[in-house]
């Protein structure tokens, strides 16, 4: 081997070693970036109507941020507001405004509206009714109307299926469908799935469900989703407030959010989540033409 060739090989080896050193440094930097990214655990609890969307958002968010954990729990809007107020949850999911919940300091909570949801009265198919006036609906739920034949339906006794008192769905339905009047005594179910099952199995049953529950169209089988005053519960009718039984979906925090909580709320309102909001039967905030307090 000539002296010239030897010098060339030494130079080539030096270049290769230097490149290896820098490659190693780059690899270490990438690893450190992943380790020092967003991390921590939070809990979002409350509304079962919002839970399907919150569950999906949690999954997508943690896929993007593997160091973060978002635990989503139900329990109803009242439970969510109580838990975020006490600090046992970082986010309180609610169908109702915090000011409408007794026993908490609503002024300590920050409202984050993430979408809109509609609700509808539903009956067993055998009731043979597809539309009611608002006054008929109130009459049924307050116990003044006791048989479906009184509103043009079948000769079947009406059975009322209520939701638990902690339910934001119940509070919203009472406020906007029943004008604040309390329902008569009836059966009580604590979840949308239970309501669907009991209404389908009980001739003459009536209750109410979030429209997002029908993102799976098969769940409508065996049920009539009622028009009210001739107005159907559709996205178009809700965005213009033509159909009145709807509410904002709130994600309350105790004061200003930080860290994982803040990042998760930002993600909930991102363009990426908008398609999921629509797909799951909710309405993006930006699509609303009407507002309410």
Which residue ranges define each predicted feature?
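Bacterial N-terminal signal peptides that target proteins for export
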Residues: 2-12
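Exported/periplasmic ABC-transporter solute-binding proteins
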Residues: 3, 21, 26-78, 82-85, ...
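Bacterial N-terminal signal peptides
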Residues: 12-20
């Amino acid at each position: 081997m000539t002296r010239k060739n030897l010098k060339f090989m030494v130079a080539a080896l030096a270049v290769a070693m230097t490149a290896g050193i820098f490659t190693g440094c780059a690899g270490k930097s990438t690893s450190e970036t992943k380790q020092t990214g967003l991390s921590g655990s939070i809990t979002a609890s409350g509304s079962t109507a919002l839970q399907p969307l919150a569950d999906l958002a949690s999954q997508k968010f943690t896929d993007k941020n593997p160091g973060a954990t978002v635990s989503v729990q139900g329990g109803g809007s009242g439970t969510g507001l109580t838990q975020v107020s006490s600090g046992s949850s970082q986010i309180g999911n609610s169908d109702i405004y915090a000011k409408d919940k007794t026993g908490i300091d609503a002024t300590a909570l920050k409202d984050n509206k993430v979408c809109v949801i509609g609700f509808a009265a539903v009956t067993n198919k055998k009731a043979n009714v597809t539309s009611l006036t608002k006054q008929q609906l109130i009459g049924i739920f307050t116990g003044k109307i006791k048989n479906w034949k009184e509103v043009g339906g079948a000769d079947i006794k009406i059975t009322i299926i209520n939701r638990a008192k902690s339910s934001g769905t119940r509070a919203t339905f009472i406020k906007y469908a029943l004008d604040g009047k309390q329902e008569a005594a009836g059966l009580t179910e604590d979840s949308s799935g239970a309501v669907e099952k009991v209404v389908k199995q009980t001739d003459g049953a009536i209750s109410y469900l979030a429209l997002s529950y029908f993102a799976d169209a098969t769940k409508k089988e065996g049920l009539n989703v009622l028009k009210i005053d001739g107005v159907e519960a559709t996205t178009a009718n809700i965005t213009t407030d033509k159909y009145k039984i709807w509410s904002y979906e709130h994600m309350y925090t105790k004061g200003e959010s930080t860290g994982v909580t803040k990042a998760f709320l930002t993600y909930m309102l991102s363009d990426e989540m908008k398609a999921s909001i629509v797909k799951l039967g909710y309405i993006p905030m930006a699509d609303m033409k009407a507002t309410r307090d």
